[in-house]
């Protein structure tokens, strides 16, 4: 089994009435938040119209409470750049009313994200040396700038910010899923260690910002992922770091228009975004956020420059990166080995942070730079899939 998240998401079957916004449906058996929905407004919705819509929703909330729908109403509001919307608990009649508002683009059920069990075994980290040597090698070769002055947003299961790997460079950003500011699965800490750990990391001087969207069972709603992206954009903008930030999401699943749209806004704002291609050995075009064309979608390679057997493939993939038997940090101290495209994506985030610091490129141009530096070395990458492997441009 391999390290990756799965979003049980949505098809494009419309349940809406004529001239109403689409209400996207979920496949049979999908796990969703009971009566939970994500509402996305049209791109041209003004701030004033959005405010008026929210006032109207507040009145609906009052009526739903009177009808006995406990906990009903808006739970999260998204208002950044070209994405305005919200998520919450609504009954069927209310959703029909919402979809009939001409300012609403679409409505989709709030699906549950779940974490897969990951492979763990002790083995030396080979990924760092591979990405800094064209023909492979045992040493990691890098510039001493090492990601200095760059922030890495890890949208995941949390990060053990006190781990010695981070040398005080990790901070807690936001928790959008529970009240436990810890990493209950170990996945987020492992990812952060690959990006910026002193031993296992690529950008060894970058700052890590933990954005928790998955609980100790490795689960959380799609609305929480969107909220995590929203928070990261706002936080980076507040500190003047949008073009000096990378955002990693080692998660994904079937197509979600809302998640793709939110992810694209981070890149438009100036950030680099890396995401996992997926672990089902299928075409990743049907997955989100991997199918969002503006993100850097990363597939997993092996020690021998082959496609990892579990890795997704397809034209949405931008690069391959090491994703098999990757050693990195573990919560509470020490290390552990994991495999998956979840491990490949942070390699790309780390190299992006490294190049942002070394070359001064803006974050949202880093994916193009990664592709320019990459090497066509992957054997049997899959149909209509790039053979290019991540490389940091060390000259070796």
Curated annotation (Swiss-Prot):
Residues 376-389 have a biased composition (Polar residues). Residues 21-116 form a propeptide. The keyword Protease applies. It comes from the Eukaryota. GO terms for biological process: proteolysis. Residues 376-396 are annotated as: Disordered. Its EC number is 3.4.21.-. One of its GO terms (molecular function) is serine-type endopeptidase activity. Keywords: Glycoprotein, Hydrolase, Protease, Secreted, Serine protease, Signal, Virulence, Zymogen. Residues 37-113 form the Inhibitor I9 domain. Residues 125-396 form the Peptidase S8 domain. Glycans are attached at residues 63, 230, 248, 392. It is found in: Secreted. GO terms for cellular component: extracellular region. Induction: Expression is moderately increased during growth on protein-rich medium. Expression levels are the same whether keratin is present or not in the protein-rich medium. The keyword Metal-binding does not apply. The active site is at 156 (charge relay system), 187 (charge relay system), 342 (charge relay system). Secreted subtilisin-like serine protease with keratinolytic activity that contributes to pathogenicity. Belongs to the peptidase S8 family. This is Subtilisin-like protease 5. It comes from Trichophyton rubrum (Athlete's foot fungus).
């Amino acid at each position: 089994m391999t390290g990756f998240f799965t979003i049980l998401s949505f098809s494009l079957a419309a349940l809406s009435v004529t001239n109403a916004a689409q209400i996207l449906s979920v496949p049979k058996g999908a796990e969703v938040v009971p009566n939970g929905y994500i509402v996305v407004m049209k791109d041209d919705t003004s701030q004033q119209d959005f405010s008026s819509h929210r006032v109207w929703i507040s009145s609906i909330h009052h009526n739903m409470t009177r009808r006995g729908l406990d906990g009903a109403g808006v739970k999260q509001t998204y208002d950044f750049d070209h994405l305005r919307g919200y998520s919450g608990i609504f009954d069927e009649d209310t959703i029909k009313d919402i979809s009939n508002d001409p300012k609403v683009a679409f409505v989709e059920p709030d699906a549950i994200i779940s974490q897969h069990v990951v492979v763990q075994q002790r083995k030396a980290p080979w990924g760092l040396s591979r990405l800094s040597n064209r023909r492979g090698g045992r040493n990691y070769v890098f510039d001493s700038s090492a990601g200095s002055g760059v922030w890495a947003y890890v949208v995941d299961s949390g990060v053990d910010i006190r781990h010695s790997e981070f040398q005080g460079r990790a901070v807690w950003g936001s928790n959008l899923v529970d009240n436990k500011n810890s990493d209950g699965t170990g996945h987020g800490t492992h990812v952060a260690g690959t990006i910026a750990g002193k031993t296992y990391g690529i950008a060894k001087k970058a700052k890590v910002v933990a954005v928790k969207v998955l609980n100790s069972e490795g689960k959380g709603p799609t609305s929480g992922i969107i909220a995590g992206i929203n928070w990261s954009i706002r936080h980076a903008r507040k500190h003047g770091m949008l073009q000096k930030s990378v955002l990693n999401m080692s998660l994904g699943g079937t197509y979600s228009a809302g998640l793709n749209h939110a992810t694209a806004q981070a890149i438009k704002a100036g950030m680099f975004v890396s995401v996992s291609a997926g672990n089902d050995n299928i075409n990743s075009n049907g997955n989100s956020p991997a199918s969002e064309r503006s993100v850097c979608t990363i597939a997993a390679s092996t020690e021998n420059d082959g496609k990892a057997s579990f890795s997704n493939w397809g034209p949405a993939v931008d690069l391959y990166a090491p994703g098999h038997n990757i050693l990195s940090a573990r919560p509470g101290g020490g290390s552990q080995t994991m495999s998956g495209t979840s491990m490949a994506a942070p390699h790309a985030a780390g190299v992006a942070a490294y190049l942002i610091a070394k070359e001064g490129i803006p974050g949202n141009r880093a994916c193009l730079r990664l592709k320019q530096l990459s090497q066509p070395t992957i054997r049997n990458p899959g149909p209509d899939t790039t053979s290019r492997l991540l490389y940091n441009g060390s000259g070796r």
